[in-house]
Amino acid sequence: MRDITPDICDQFEDQVTLLNLPLQNFGQRTAFHGEIVTVRCYHDNSKVREVLEQDGTGKVLIVDGHGSCQKALLGDQLAILGIENGWEGIIVYGAVRDVAQMSQMDIGVQALGTCPFKTEKRGVGEVNVTLTMLNQIVQPKHHVYADWNGVLISKEALDF
């Protein structure tokens, strides 16, 4: 994979903002981008599953798990679901699990960290809402660009 975010910053510096979160890469695809779809949830990944069941062609799911690493909001089964439905990547402001398997899967995955515990399944959460993570705003329908160097957000799709 090539580094995409430095090139984007060089070419579109005034059109992007840095999503300054301490994220780590867990998927095989370490550079990915797409239109943002959002989920806000806490210790319940029901809405994550609902969204990943939809067509994700050209899209990246950003999950606001309130920064909690006490339950994993994404595991190998949901990552497989994302791959089957064409998602470019998933960014979790929280924890993931099954990371050995996920590292072999052709999908971008970034998260704060790992946790072996699964979440509850109560159908709780919000989809396509504005997220605020560490005082940074993420809007649905904006665009995200992620790699080892960081995560960038733009209002429009960038031709790079």
UniProtKB/Swiss-Prot annotation:
The lineage of its organism: Bacteria, Pseudomonadati, Pseudomonadota, Gammaproteobacteria, Vibrionales. Keywords: Lyase, Metal-binding. Homotrimer. Its EC number is 4.1.3.17, 4.1.1.112. InterPro entries: RraA, RraA/RraA-like, RraA/RraA-like_sf. It is an enzyme of class 4 (lyase). Belongs to the class II aldolase/RraA-like family. One of its GO terms (molecular function) is metal ion binding. It catalyses: 4-hydroxy-4-methyl-2-oxoglutarate = 2 pyruvate; oxaloacetate + H(+) = pyruvate + CO2. It comes from Vibrio parahaemolyticus serotype O3:K6 (strain RIMD 2210633). Substrate binds at residues 75-78, 97. NCBIfam families: NOT-MenG, PRK09372.1, PRK12487.1. Its cofactor is a divalent metal cation. Divalent metal cation. This is Putative 4-hydroxy-4-methyl-2-oxoglutarate aldolase. GO terms for biological process: regulation of RNA metabolic process. Catalyzes the aldol cleavage of 4-hydroxy-4-methyl-2-oxoglutarate (HMG) into 2 molecules of pyruvate. Also contains a secondary oxaloacetate (OAA) decarboxylase activity due to the common pyruvate enolate transition state formed following C-C bond cleavage in the retro-aldol and decarboxylation reactions. A divalent metal cation binds at residue 98. It comes from the Bacteria.
